[in-house]
């Protein structure tokens, strides 16, 4: 029985070594993927803003003085750059120092929230740790895209392009609610949503008004579909995920075998014939 337990322990150690190798590969794959994703996010954010300003709300954009148009474009580029920096920071936080943090305060906050993301991948000793690390990282990616779109919509609203009568919180809630059912604007690039928002009219009790709005909504699936490099990076991650899931099943099986063997040994050790 002792030999059986020792063999199971050796099997578990071998699995943990394999997990560490997969974790290293996954960390490297995410570094490549997030670098490409950051570039794609910058491009898609600018493209979505361009179509929103020129096709969705051309009058609002034309009403801006030339200097304000330039400033708006610069601010949009900066938001894209900050989002790209944050995406890579999720996987490389151990290489960043305080002076390299993005300037945007909300981005600095999110970088700190996910400041421990990189460590578990390198130190993962079992498939559960690796799966948790990846789940946290995917949540961080989704949060970054959401924040970039939110800040861009807010910028466009402050510039008078998006309807100003909708408070930013109302717009954000509408975007959240329409995430599953919202439709992309026909004939436009991805990452735009066509929204119809009903608001109460306080001047005339009992009546409400309907506001049509086009807003930016960055979708990871659409960004990956539009960029071959990002899509290839995601495919590599999926291949490693398959290996990690297989290791997880085997690891849990070995853990159960060890528990059974230890319980059997404990029973025999405490049993005595009367």
Describe these PLM feature segments.
Residues 1-35:
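N-terminal alpha-helical "arm" segments
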Residues 7, 14, 18-21, 136, ...:
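Charged, amphipathic alpha-helical oligomerization/scaffolding segments
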Residues 32, 36, 40-200:
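Eukaryotic long, low-complexity intrinsically disordered regulatory regions enriched in serine/proline
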Residues 3, 10, 42, 69, ...:
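Arginine residue identity/basic-tract feature
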Residues 189-274:
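Alpha-helical oligomerization segments
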Residues 2, 9, 24, 120, ...:
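A near-ubiquitous, low-amplitude feature marking generic local secondary-structure context
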Residues 23-26, 30, 34-37, 41-44, ...:
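Coiled-coil heptad-register positions
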């Amino acid at each position: 029985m002792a030999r059986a337990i020792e063999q199971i322990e050796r099997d578990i150690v071998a699995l943990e070594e394999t997990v560490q190798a997969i974790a290293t590969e996954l960390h490297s794959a995410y570094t490549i993927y997030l670098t490409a994703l950051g570039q794609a996010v910058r491009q898609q954010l600018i493209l979505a803003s361009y179509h929103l300003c020129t096709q969705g709300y051309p009058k609002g954009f034309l009403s801006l003085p030339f200097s304000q148009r330039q400033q708006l474009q610069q601010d949009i580029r900066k938001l894209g750059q900050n989002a790209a920096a944050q995406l890579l920071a999720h996987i490389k936080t151990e290489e960043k120092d305080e002076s390299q943090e993005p300037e945007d305060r909300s981005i600095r906050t999110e970088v700190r929230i996910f400041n421990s993301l990189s460590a578990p991948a390198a130190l993962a000793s079992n498939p559960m740790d690796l799966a948790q690390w990846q789940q946290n990282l995917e949540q961080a990616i989704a949060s970054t895209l959401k924040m970039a779109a939110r800040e861009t919509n807010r910028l466009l609203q402050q510039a008078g392009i998006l309807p100003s009568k909708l408070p930013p919180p109302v717009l954000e809630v509408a975007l959240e609610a329409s995430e599953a059912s919202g439709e992309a604007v026909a004939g436009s690039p991805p990452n735009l949503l066509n929204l119809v928002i009903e608001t109460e009219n306080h001047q005339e009790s009992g009546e409400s008004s309907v506001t049509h709005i086009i807003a930016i909504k960055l979708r990871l699936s659409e960004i990956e579909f539009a960029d071959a490099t990002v899509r290839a990076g995601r495919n590599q991650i999926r291949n490693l995920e398959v290996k990690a899931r297989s290791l997880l099943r085997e690891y849990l099986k070995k853990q159960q075998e060890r528990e059974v063997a230890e319980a059997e040994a404990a029973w025999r050790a405490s049993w005595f014939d009367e």
